[in-house]
From Swiss-Prot:
Protein name: OTU domain-containing protein 4
An MF annotation (GO) of this entry: K63-linked deubiquitinase activity
Residues with Phosphotyrosine modification: 120, 438, 459
Mutant lacking the gene: phenotype: Mice are born at sub-Mendelian rate.
Record GO biological process: antiviral innate immune response; DNA alkylation repair; negative regulation of interleukin-1-mediated signaling pathway; negative regulation of toll-like receptor signaling pathway; protein K11-linked deubiquitination; protein K48-linked deubiquitination; protein K63-linked deubiquitination; proteolysis
Residue positions, PTM Phosphoserine: 126, 128, 166, 199, 202, 204, 340, 442, 544, 895, 1000, 1005, 1016-1017, 1042
Residues of the active site: 42, 45, 148
Provenance organism: Mus musculus (Mouse)
Self-association and partners: Interacts with MYD88; the interaction is direct. Interacts with ALKBH3; the interaction is direct. Interacts with USP7; the interaction is direct. Interacts with USP9X; the interaction is direct.
Domain OTU: 34-155
Segments of skewed composition (Polar residues): 226-236, 1032-1041
Region of interest (Variable-loop), residue spans: 94-104
Assigned EC number: 3.4.19.12
Modified residues (Phosphothreonine): 131
């Protein structure tokens, strides 16, 4: 609207730009014989121009405005279509004299006064006839600055108006004031008259000259004292009348009186504004650092003794006199001596600001000094505050000094801080820092900015990034160099106690919370006692361990370069008190109210000691210990684990902005990359060279470590689904071609579990030895790194390196790995690649991650051990491995046929413990490859049968087993775990009794473990039902001919028949089976086996666990 005060007139009136564009407009109008008369630059400029040209007086502009409003209301149907919004509200706004108007009002005025409007807008451009009503009279206007209208007259108007004006003033002074004007005009020299005439060339030049003079001399609102330019102001000693009167009396000069009156009132308002601004900026008693008192340019220090509208009275310290300076030059920012503890002031924008303590000095040297900062919290140094490394403990009254780099940062910040009353200056400065961050924003923009900031902080809290929670709080550092996080620890130095003073605990906690959310500190070198230095590269030197009350005892010392065996790690040496009340320096006093984990938590698979090259903050019940030298120290309890939520938090950011998107590693070209092998070299030489792959697995590791309660599937699967959705929506996006292994890459066949390719590895791996055929129980603590490693099928087929199943690993860390047999080749099974997530024959139906994940959920990528009952149903023996089985018959895996008889007979405790212990014992005996002797007859029969078949050599397994496995391999469309032995033909069974003992006792033993004793009084009915279904008597004689009586079963469970039934006549009609015949294993009653192994590979033992 209004142009800025004191701005050059060309900017205000130039229709297209700066001052040089304004002069061509005046020249163009003169060329056309026209003259532009300036009009007051306010909202009534149009009505002023029309009032002068129609009513011959600008003072009647309000009358013209009200007449226009009435005309618009009376002719509403003509103008309402051109008004946005409510027409009545628009007319109500027009009643304000400062409301700017436009085309609608010009059309109304044209119809009201029956005059067409012609408007000049640009130089050398024909004017615009905005109203074409064909009225004979015209109103000429000049449009400039996008909203301002000036009057355009013929150039003869200026000359005639100058003559009329001189006659009018001459009559006024001679007849009214009784002044002989003719003598005064004759007494003036010709040069002075010419100067008066030249000074009138353009009113805009007068305004511009005045503005330049003001800008040069009126610094900070103070005007130069005396009459430096007497020709511009008031009466001169040589002239009896003012310059303005003499100008009005000159017949050759036209004086724009209306514009001069508006300009004078504008300058008076400017003086009042300066006075208010000076009152806000200065007060009596403030200290001025640099005051220019004479013309030689010398600067001196002074105290302000008076604040007035124009000139301020100051007392010079060097001269000992009071002066009214012409101006106050602010000192350079580098030499400011900022005293903390006072509020800053907010003068007008563009002016330099000083702290009021810079002028008055510290009033109370014993008052606590707080750290000022003009930067918002997001830009502050992590430890922005008072530099306390340069003062001694005795000079308590001396002010702390700041480095020049910090002053430069302070000078870059705009001066947008207001001054507060003295009673408010004791408040914490943090509030002003936060307010300055949002200064100048509308309420909507401020709320939007705060919402974005809160969303970002929430995302940091969810991801528990190390950047969001530093190892050391910077606010506690800025308070005092020896201040500890524990309030019970006494302060060591005297100046810290002096500075402690009246520090408010709540404000300190708030600063801790803010800094711990924003800052991230690192320790770069060993600190010195009672020394605190904060460098500009955001690296802090922490107080030495002597500041702490006591040190936490570290575990057994080891050399840094020593290899750390991780197969049997010791539990973390952290006392229970640390879990209950951790005293971490950066932990805020008020933690989020999330459900925390149990006190017995611990990172899974983390060794007891890790050599740490930097200063490691170890938590203890009393203090924090900083160790700057390279020593193995206990793994610290992470703050993330203390506040780890039990359930996943909601996703706040877009899936496409997630650092783990698209849920799988991509190379630099954007193609899907195969997961790299484990990095075993301590130097990191075997890390991937591709930064994208390294970044993905780094982010995945940070998130998995920060959120141990979340399965990686819970946040990788939605990202993968989003990527697949993007591929469907945008066909140009290439669909990734998935490799065979969608989770882990198969390890090199030459590398075994016990041999590490790198000599300086972090850890060495070796298979756990079995004692007396049993695997040792898992230790009560975090599982070893050796357990979750994925073993490729090549190693499994060779019979070594198989890992035992540990129940603790499943319960603590579900969903971390896939089973070993997951790498089955997809060739020949499907034309299309399988998705890494979602429904597939490996993982089963996988829904989108719900808000709560149970521990036993079939969608999880559970670790791939065949002993894991949750994953038995999904285990498939790869076709390339089926023909290379070299394991003895009695050591067949549970997932292929049935439970091992040797395991059942040799470990009677497994019948009580369930499938977990049984599986672990069975696999351990299989790994050792030993055939344990047993006193029972069934075990001896198995040994005899297996001994004869094992002599045939590798690559020639028993015919019975291979035929049972190879035949359904080609008939099944999908890899499924089934009871393959039921499809063989009767003539292939050479010894039915022995073969039956091979297949049945395992199932019988499982049945005997879980099934209650039941009577078999319905046997005859079941047999009759079988006969009615079309079975021959030969089938009945073959199947049940050698059945044992109930007294000979040797078990209280529902045993069943110990022999394999023939399959030829059992198939029945061709369409009765999904797989060319039933595969149900019949029992005493003839009912189908309840644990159908096509659907549930877990058998009755697993069902018994969950019932």
């Amino acid at each position: 609207m209004e142009a800025a005060v004191g701005a050059p007139d060309g900017v205000d009136q130039g229709g297209v730009g700066p001052l040089e564009d304004e002069t061509p407009m005046d020249a163009y109008l003169r060329k056309l014989g026209l003259y532009r008369k300036l009009v007051a630059k306010d909202g009534s400029c149009l009505f002023r121009a029309v009032a002068e040209q129609v009513l011959h007086s600008q003072s009647r502009h309000v009358e013209v405005r009200m007449a226009c409003i009435r005309y618009l209301r009376e002719n509403r149907e003509k103008f309402e279509a051109f008004i946005e919004g409510s027409f009545e509200e628009y007319l109500k706004r027009l009643e304000n004299p400062q409301e700017w108007v436009g085309q609608v009002e010009i059309s109304a005025l044209s119809l009201m006064y029956r005059k067409d409007f012609v408007i000049y807008q640009e130089p050398n451009v024909s004017p615009s006839h905005v109203t074409e009503n064909n009225f004979p009279e015209k109103v000429l206007l000049c449009f400039s600055n996008g909203n301002h209208y000036d009057i355009v007259y013929p150039i003869t108007y200026k000359d005639s108006s100058a003559m009329c004006q001189s006659l009018l003033y001459e009559l006024l002074y001679e007849k009214v004031f009784k002044t002989d004007v003719s003598k005064i005009m004759m007494g003036l020299e010709a040069s002075e008259v010419a100067e008066e005439s030249n000074s009138e060339i353009s009113d805009s030049e007068d305004d511009s000259c005045k503005s330049k003079s003001t800008a040069a001399t009126d610094v900070n609102g103070f005007k130069p004292s005396g009459s430096e330019n007497p020709k511009n102001n008031g009466n001169s000693a040589d002239l009896p009348l003012s310059r303005k009167v003499l100008k009005s009396l000159n017949p050759a000069v036209y004086r724009n009186v209306e514009y001069e009156i508006w300009l004078k009132s504008k300058q008076a308002q400017q003086k009042r504004d300066y006075s208010i601004a000076a009152g806000l900026q200065y007060e009596v008693g403030d200290k001025c650092h640099q005051v220019r008192l004479d013309h030689n340019g010398k600067l001196s220090n002074a105290d302000i003794h008076g604040v007035h509208s124009e000139n301020g009275l100051v007392l010079s310290e060097e001269l000992g006199k009071k002066h009214t300076p012409k101006n106050l030059k602010p000192p350079p920012p580098e030499s400011w001596n900022t005293v903390s503890g006072k509020k800053m002031k907010k003068p007008n924008s563009g002016q330099n600001f000083h702290s009021d303590t810079d002028y008055r000095g510290p009033k109370n040297l014993n008052k606590p000094i707080k750290a000022p900062s003009a930067l918002p919290p997001r830009l502050q140094h992590p430890s922005s505050g008072v530099r306390q490394h340069a003062f001694s403990s005795h000079s308590t009254g001396s002010q702390s000094q700041k480095s020049s780099s910090e002053h430069k940062n302070l000078s870059r910040m705009p001066s947008q801080i207001t001054r507060k009353p003295d009673r408010e200056r004791a408040e914490d400065f943090d509030h002003v820092s936060r307010e300055s961050y949002y200064f100048g924003l509308s309420p909507e923009e401020r709320r939007e900015k705060q919402a974005i900031e809160e969303s970002r902080l929430l995302y940091e809290i969810q991801n528990r990034d190390e950047q969001a929670f530093p190892a050391l709080s910077s606010s506690s550092v800025s308070q005092s160099p020896s201040q500890n996080s524990n309030a019970c620890v006494p302060r060591k130095s005297s100046h810290a106690r002096d500075r402690k003073g009246s520090m408010r605990r709540a404000d300190a906690e708030e600063r801790k919370d803010k800094d711990s959310l924003r800052g991230h500190t690192h320790v770069d070198k060993k600190p010195e006692p009672s020394t605190l230095e904060i460098s500009d590269d955001k690296c802090t030197r922490v107080s030495s361990p002597s500041k702490s009350k006591k040190e936490c005892p570290s575990p057994v010392e080891q050399k840094p370069a020593e290899h750390i065996p991780l197969s049997n790690p010791a539990p973390l040496l952290v006392s229970p008190e640390v879990h209950l009340t951790p005293a971490v320096p950066s932990l805020p006093a008020t933690v989020p109210a999330w459900p925390s984990e149990p006190t017995t938590f611990g990172p899974t698979g983390v060794p007891a000691q890790i050599p740490i090259l930097s200063v490691t903050q170890t938590t203890g019940p009393d203090a924090a210990v900083s160790q700057a030298h390279l020593t193995p120290s206990p793994v610290p309890v992470s703050i993330q684990a203390v506040n780890q939520p039990l359930m996943p938090l909601p996703q706040t950011m877009s899936l496409y902005q997630d650092p783990l998107y698209p849920g799988f590693p991509c190379s630099e070209k954007g193609d899907r990359a195969i997961a790299p092998p484990y990095s075993l070299c301590q130097t990191g030489e075997d890390l991937p060279k591709d930064k994208n792959i390294l970044r993905f697995f780094f982010n995945l590791g940070v998130k998995a470590y920060s959120c141990p309660m979340w399965a990686p599937h819970s946040y990788l699967y939605p990202l993968h689904q989003a990527y697949m959705a993007a591929c469907r929506m945008y066909p140009k996006v290439p669909v990734p071609v998935y490799p065979q292994n969608t989770w882990f890459q198969e390890a090199p066949p030459a590398q075994s579990e016990s041999d590490c390719p790198c000599t300086d590895a972090h850890y060495s791996l070796h298979p756990e030895a079995s004692v007396n055929g049993q695997m040792p129980q898992a230790e009560m603590g975090p599982p070893a790194f050796a357990s979750p490693l994925v073993i490729p099928p090549s190693q499994v087929s060779e019979g070594h390196g198989q890992l035992s199943y540990q129940p603790e690993l499943e319960s603590e860390n579900p969903g971390q790995l896939l089973h070993a047999e997951y790498e089955e080749s997809l060739s020949g099974k499907n034309m299309y690649p399988q998705q890494s997530f979602g429904p597939n024959p490996f993982l089963g139906p996988v829904p989108i991650a719900p808000p709560f994940f149970p521990h036993v959920w079939y969608g999880y990528p559970f670790q791939g051990f065949v002993e894991n009952p949750v994953m038995r149903q999904n285990i498939v023996l790869p076709p390339d491995d089926k023909g290379e089985l070299d394991l003895p018959l009695e050591n067949l895996d549970l997932s292929k046929e049935c439970d091992s008889v040797s395991a059942v007979d040799e470990f009677p405790d497994a019948r009580v413990e369930g499938a977990h212990s049984l599986s672990a014992a069975s696999v351990s005996s299989k790994h050792e490859g030993r055939v344990e002797q047993s006193s029972q007859t069934r075990k001896a029969d198995i040994d005899l049968a297996s001994g004869s078949s094992a002599v045939e050599g590798k690559g020639h397994p028993p015919t019975q087993i291979l035929n049972r496995e190879r035949e359904p391999g080609s008939a099944e469309p999908e890899p499924k775990r089934t009871i393959q032995s039921l499809k063989e033909k009767p003539e292939k069974v050479k010894d039915p009794k022995t073969a039956a003992d091979v297949v049945s006792p395992g199932a019988n033993s499982v049945d005997r473990l879980q099934r209650p004793k039941e009577e078999s009084s319905e046997d005859e009915n079941e047999v009759s039902n079988i006969l009615r279904s079309g079975r021959s008597k030969q089938f009945y004689n073959q199947t049940y001919g050698s059945r044992k009586y109930k007294s000979d079963w040797g078990s209280s469970g529902r045993g069943g028949y110990q022999h394999v039934r023939g399959e030829e006549s059992w198939k029945g009609q061709p369409n009765r089976s999904r797989d060319e015949g039933y595969q149900y294993h019949r029992h005493v009653r003839g009912r189908p086996y309840r644990g159908d192994r096509r659907r549930s590979g877990m058998g009755d033992g697993h069902r018994g666990q969950h019932t």
